[in-house]
Design a protein with these regions (language model features):
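Structural microenvironment flanking redox-active thiols in thiol-disulfide oxidoreductases
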Residues: 1-38, 49-54
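Short secondary-structure boundary/hinge segments and terminal tails
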Residues: 24, 54, 72, 119-120
Length: 138
């Protein structure tokens, strides 16, 4: 697991669930906590009930990764790999690459990638709705 791989280097992961419990209950916070516990994911898990964090960060998908340096500056945003539904077929490891490059003291080659996953479930909208200004990042 990526979080375990980088833990010894001081990297910490935090999951934030911004999905509306009213739109798609399968992805609500409690359901995802159950999944977190089942798979023993090694990170803190927070709930963005108001969806203000998702709006502030511009979150489009779940998951949508954000990497911050020690100065809390955003240095990477986007996907983990290019085939999240089938890990063995991946050809790109964007999140791992970004972390390795940063920890080696190098500039991140691709600091912006398109997140891949289900859309954030917005309160008061149907489950596949996306904001009108949402688009691919690159």
């Amino acid at each position: 697991m990526i979080a375990d791989r980088f833990a010894s280097q001081g990297v910490r992961f935090v999951g934030i669930n911004s999905n509306s419990k009213n739109t798609y209950s399968e992805d609500d916070f409690n359901g995802m906590v159950t999944r977190l516990e089942k798979h023993q994911f090694p990170w803190i898990y927070l709930y963005d009930e108001s969806q203000a964090v998702a709006v502030a960060y511009g979150a489009l998908r779940t998951p949508h990764f954000y990497v911050f340096n020690k100065e809390r500056e955003l240095i990477y945003t986007g996907r983990s790999i290019d085939t999240p539904r089938h890990w063995p077929d991946h050809t790109k490891t964007d999140l791992i690459d970004a972390l390795e490059q940063h920890l080696a003291g190098n500039v991140i080659e691709n600091p912006l990638t398109n997140p891949i996953g289900c859309n954030v479930k917005w309160d008061g909208q149907e489950k596949h709705w996306m904001p009108s200004d949402a688009c691919d990042l690159v």
